[in-house]
Amino acid sequence: MEDSGKTFSSEEEEANYWKDLAMTYKQRAENTQEELREFQEGSREYEAELETQLQQIETRNRDLLSENNRLRMELETIKEKFEVQHSEGYRQISALEDDLAQTKAIKDQLQKYIRELEQANDDLERAKRATIMSLEDFEQRLNQAIERNAFLESELDEKENLLESVQRLKDEARDLRQELAVQQKQEKPRTPMPSSVEAERTDTAVQATGSVPSTPIAHRGPSSSLNTPGSFRRGLDDSTGGTPLTPAARISALNIVGDLLRKVGALESKLASCRNLVYDQSPNRTGGPASGRSSKNRDGGERRPSSTSVPLGDKGLDTSCRWLSKSTTRSSSSC
């Protein structure tokens, strides 16, 4: 368009101009065609390559789709499994929480039970200590009671021995009274006054024997010469040797034993005086007026000497025996 307004000086110049322009456009056309062919060839190659790539991409896409479908199926399966596991885990967690709550409650109960057991154990230990103390006290009292029983048994044995001795002395006194009565029947004494004096002396000795106060064992007199059984002393030593008695109980027991021994000694002295009385009256028997007096006694019932001596001795002996029995009973109860 720019060339249309151009002016040429000649036609040849214009023809050359147009020839050159035609050649230029022709060259451009050839170049353009060549470029077109190259572009077409490149396009075909590129198209083939694109088709190949497209096929590959489609194949890959199909593979990916199948893989995607498989993965989706797996995802669904995994989701289902996850839901199942989640629900199962939730149930397990709920069960574990319930178990934990129960365990905590059981733990609290066990702790409370342990505290109660500890308190009960403390109470039992205190009760055990109290029981042990009471048992020791009971054993001590039992041992004391056993010792007292042993001491009382020894005293009972001694009482029986003393009663046997008293009975023996009573038998001897009765025999002596019978012998004295026989001798008085056979012979009448010269002077009846000594007999009355001896009877009164015997009665006084018996009354003194019954009224002797309790004195300590250190003041006993004739008890050392009595035939006291050794078993009582051994029993007394054995009973008081393990656990000593209190001083008051020991002094009381010794006083009672000393009094009993003095009473027995007095009874033996009384019997000895009766024997001496019989032996003193035996050489002084006469036959004259004494026989008449004795017959008068048998007839009239006077018999003053024998009535004053023999019944009086029997009465004193019985009184001494009763007092001895009461004293032994009091000693047993006091010990």
From Swiss-Prot:
What changing residue 246 to V does, per the record, is: Retained on spindle poles during mitosis, no loss of phosphorylation in vivo and increased ZNF365-binding
Reading the lineage from the top rank, the first entry is Eukaryota
Phenotype for residue 106 to D: Loss of interaction with RAB9A. Decreased enrichment to RAB9A-associated intracellular vesicles
Q: Where is the composition biased (Polar residues)?
A: 204-214
Q: Which GO terms describe its cellular component?
A: centrosome; cleavage furrow; cytoplasmic vesicle membrane; cytosol; kinesin complex; kinetochore; membrane; microtubule
UniProt note on tissues of expression: Expressed in the neuroepithelium throughout the developing brain, including the cerebral cortex and cerebellum.
Write out the PTM section of this UniProt entry: Phosphorylated in mitosis. Phosphorylated in vitro by CDC2. Phosphorylation at Thr-246 is essential for the G2/M transition.
Q: Name one GO biological process term.
A: mitotic centrosome separation
**According to its UniProt record, where is this protein located?**
Cytoplasm, Cytoskeleton; Cytoplasm, Cytoskeleton, Microtubule organizing center, Centrosome; Chromosome, Centromere, Kinetochore; Cytoplasm, Cytoskeleton, Spindle
Impact after mutating residue 114 to D: Loss of interaction with RAB9A. Decreased enrichment to RAB9A-associated intracellular vesicles
Query: Mutating residue 282 to A: effect?
Result: Retained on spindle poles during mitosis, no loss of phosphorylation in vivo and increased ZNF365-binding
Claim: Chloroplast is one of the keywords in the record: no
Q: Coiled-coil regions in this chain?
A: 18-188
The chain residues annotated with the modification Phosphoserine are 211, 231, 239, 282, 309
Region Self-association, as annotated, extends over: 1-93
Region named Interaction with PAFAH1B1: 88-156
* GO MF annotation, one: identical protein binding
PTM sites of type Phosphothreonine: 215, 228, 243, 246
Q: Outcome of residue 113 to D?
A: Loss of interaction with RAB9A
Query: Mostly located where?
Result: cytoplasm
Bias kind Low complexity: ranges:
325-335
Region called Interaction with CENPF, residue ranges: 167-290
Consequence of mutating residue 191 to V?
Retained on spindle poles during mitosis, no loss of phosphorylation in vivo and increased ZNF365-binding
Subunit details? Homodimer. Interacts with CNTRL, LIS1, dynein, SLMAP and TCP1. Interacts with CENPF, dynactin, tubulin gamma, PAFAH1B1, PCM1 and PCNT. Interacts with ZNF365. Interacts with GTP-bound RAB9A and RAB9B; the interaction leads to RAB9-dynein motor tethering. Interacts (via C-terminus) with MCRS1 (via C-terminus); phosphorylation of NDE1 inhibits the interaction.
Write the protein's name.
Nuclear distribution protein nudE homolog 1
